[in-house]
């Protein structure tokens, strides 16, 4: 499904300003850019675009309230300065599985003063010498890199609470999405059943008309037979009458 169509479906008759979370994972980005997302989503706090074929985020709309952004498993190699401009309050950023090769690419993230957690799993930049040390030095506001702090201690539950809450809400969204999709499917099935019933009724009417016509034909044949029989009887009586007259 194309991204703009997926966004329309995810709205579920809501206005963009009513949406706080938007999951667009595994849909298609035709030109490698974010499509169908506008600055009307002013209340959006969580956006997930995992594996959608993004090569650029240059046309990301202004999302002042966005706190968590999932961009993993795409082909992004730059344009990260857009994030500081469009998402100034971003706290969690996942860029895992993208084409980020050097530290200069993530340097623009310095302007994200509230950035607390950054994930770069499976990016070439992680192969650089002293990768973790240099990233923490470059981005002093970041507390957790790939899930661990400067001392290689895993982020405690309190610091990943946002992730857990979001996952729960995502599950609820998926359930609502499934219910909505099922409702659409049920409506389509009902329409098909109604069409089938109309065809059956039409067929019965045709059969009734045929039966009625057959009945008319049978009645006509019976009348013809009766007329012939009556004529035959008259012919029999006529010779008898002639004989009586001769006598």
UniProtKB/Swiss-Prot annotation:
Record key words, sorted: Cytoplasm, Endoplasmic reticulum, Leucine-rich repeat, Nucleus, Phosphoprotein, Repeat, Repressor, Transcription, Transcription regulation
Tissue localization of expression: Widely distributed in the central nervous system, with an abundant expression in the cerebellum.
GO annotation terms (biological process): negative regulation of plasma membrane bounded cell projection assembly; nucleocytoplasmic transport; regulation of apoptotic process
GO molecular function: cell adhesion molecule binding; histone binding; integrin binding
Region (Disordered): 150-247
All copies of domain LRRCT, residue ranges: 123-161
Chief localization: nucleus
Recorded coiled-coil stretches: none
Per-repeat ranges for LRR: 18-41, 43-64, 65-87, 89-110
Record-linked PROSITE patterns: LRR
UniProt-annotated location(s): Nucleus; Cytoplasm; Endoplasmic reticulum
Modified residues (Phosphoserine): 17, 158, 202
Oligomer status and interactors: Component of the SET complex, composed of at least ANP32A, APEX1, HMGB2, NME1, SET and TREX1. Directly interacts with SET. Interacts with ATXN1/SCA1. Interacts with MAP1B. Interacts with ELAVL1. Part of the INHAT (inhibitor of histone acetyltransferases) complex. Interacts with E4F1.
Name under which the protein is recorded: Acidic leucine-rich nuclear phosphoprotein 32 family member A
Record organism: Rattus norvegicus
Originating gene: Anp32a
């Amino acid at each position: 499904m194309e991204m703009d169509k997926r966004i329309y479906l995810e709205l579920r008759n809501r206005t963009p300003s009513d949406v706080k979370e938007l999951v667009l994972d595994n849909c298609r980005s035709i030109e490698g850019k974010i499509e169908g997302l506008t600055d009307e989503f002013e209340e959006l706090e969580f956006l997930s675009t995992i594996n959608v074929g993004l090569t650029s985020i240059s046309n990301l709309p202004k999302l002042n309230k966005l706190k968590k952004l999932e961009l993993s498993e795409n082909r992004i190699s730059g344009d990260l300065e857009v994030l500081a401009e469009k998402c100034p309050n971003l706290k969690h950023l996942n860029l895992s599985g993208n084409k980020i090769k050097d530290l200069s690419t993530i340097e623009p993230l310095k302007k994200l003063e509230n950035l607390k957690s950054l994930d770069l799993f499976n990016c070439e930049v992680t192969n650089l010498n002293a990768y973790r040390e240099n990233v923490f030095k470059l981005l002093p506001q970041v507390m957790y890199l790939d899930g661990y702090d400067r001392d290689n201690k895993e982020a405690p539950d309190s610091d990943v609470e946002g992730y857990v809450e979001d996952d729960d809400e995502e599950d609820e969204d998926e359930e609502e999405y499934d219910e909505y999709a099922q409702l659409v499917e049920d409506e389509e099935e009902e329409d098909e059943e109604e069409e089938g019933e109309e065809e059956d009724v039409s067929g019965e009417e045709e059969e009734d008309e045929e039966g009625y016509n057959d009945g008319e034909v049978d009645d006509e044949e019976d009348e013809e037979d009766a007329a012939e029989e009556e004529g035959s009887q008259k012919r029999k009586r006529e010779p008898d009458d002639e004989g009586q007259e001769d006598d």
